[in-house]
């Protein structure tokens, strides 16, 4: 399938003034810009959330099981099913970050890796991208290293169980549901 990118700079907005109003690196910054549209109109306050890029991984074991996580998400106030995910650290490529996060959160490593999507959570007001990978034939190595704020349970689910989670709207994070839907829409990308 040929990649197509219609996100061009054909009609860029001009930044007239910019002020950082919240700065909490590396997690979040909030910027307030004064911008001018191509037709000359000026928007005096346009807010942008600045985040580092994110990654997530559809990881499938040699036995064809999906490596999933369940964890409480404070923002939603509920426990959610998710695919392994995290933040890219400075100097990492998306794949390096994805491999690191998969191992840190689940203890799974190896396999064959393919980047299957690069998405924006909200291109209107967020500056980062989320890089989604498919990792096939991953194996456990037992080296889990959770961050201080992580409290998760690793679950191995069948293809049908993951598909049912999607159909029943049980995967709440859109940047995790989207690559899973893509995986299933493309027939499992020919894998497992």
Q: Where is each model-derived feature located?
A:
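Short beta-strand micro-motifs in enzyme catalytic cores
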Residues: 29-33, 79, 129-131, 153
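A glycine-rich, hydrophobic loop/mini-helix early in the fold
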Residues: 51-78, 82
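Charged phosphate-binding loop/patch that engages nucleotide di/tri-phosphates or the phosphate backbone
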Residues: 176-192
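Short, positively charged
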Residues: 7-8, 13-14, 34-40, 138
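Unchanged
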Residues: 44, 54-56, 61, 87-175
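Extreme N-terminal tail/first-helix region
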Residues: 1-25
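Acidic, metal-coordinating catalytic segment for phosphate/diphosphate chemistry
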Residues: 18-56, 62
């Amino acid at each position: 399938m040929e990649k197509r990118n219609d996100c061009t700079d054909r009609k860029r907005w001009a930044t007239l003034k910019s002020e950082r109003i919240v700065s909490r690196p590396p997690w979040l910054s909030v910027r307030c810009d004064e911008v001018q549209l191509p037709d000359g109109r000026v928007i005096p306050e346009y807010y942008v959330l600045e985040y580092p890029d994110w990654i997530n991984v559809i990881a499938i074991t040699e036995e064809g099981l999906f490596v999933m996580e369940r964890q409480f998400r404070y923002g939603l106030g509920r426990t959610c099913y998710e695919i392994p995910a995290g933040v890219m650290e400075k100097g990492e490529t998306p794949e390096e970050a994805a491999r690191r996060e998969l191992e840190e959160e689940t203890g799974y490593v190896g396999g064959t890796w393919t980047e299957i999507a690069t998405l924006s959570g909200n291109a209107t007001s967020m500056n980062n991208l989320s890089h989604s990978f498919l990792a096939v034939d991953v194996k456990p190595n037992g080296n889990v290293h959770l961050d201080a704020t992580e409290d998760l349970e690793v679950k191995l689910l069948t293809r049908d169980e993951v598909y049912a989670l999607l159909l029943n709207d049980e995967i709440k994070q859109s940047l995790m549901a989207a690559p899973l839907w893509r995986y299933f829409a493309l027939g499992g990308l020919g894998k497992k």
